[in-house]
Amino acid sequence: HLGLDAWAGFPGAAPDENAGRPGDDGRFRLGVTHAPYRRVLDAMTADGADLLLAGHTHGGQVCVPFLGALVTNCDLPRRQASGVSTWTAAGRTVPLEVSAGLGTAPSAPVRFACRPEAVVLDLVPRG
């Protein structure tokens, strides 16, 4: 945490002259959000994020075998409720990891066909 968490692109956020500024300086840019709403993923991708990380969906929490998640608790497509996929916005496509997490929603304290997970990502330099 570098004190750059007041992302200027989020509605109602306090402006931060360093946050949300795309660049071509070769630095790796990580976009992290609790809930993967499309507008947030779109804005982070447009702002230059190289990798997007999110949670909130609990992997759908209740899944149907061979069909997948029934809900995502946001506007993310159900097929992206957990795991690695890609997100395309503003002419860019970046990896998206949505963790199913360990817990459940307070309103529905149950999981079915949706294993809890703690994700470990190994990031290696390109090249």
Predicted regions and their residues:
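Binuclear metal-dependent hydrolase catalytic cores centered on His/Asp/Glu-rich metal-binding motifs
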Residues: H1-D42, A108-R115
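A mature extracytoplasmic/lumenal domain signature
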Residues: G3-D5, A100-L102, P125
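Conserved beta-sheet core of the metallophosphoesterase superfamily
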Residues: L30, P36-V119
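Short beta-strand-to-coil "C-cap" segments at the C-terminal boundary of structured domains/repeats
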Residues: L121-G127
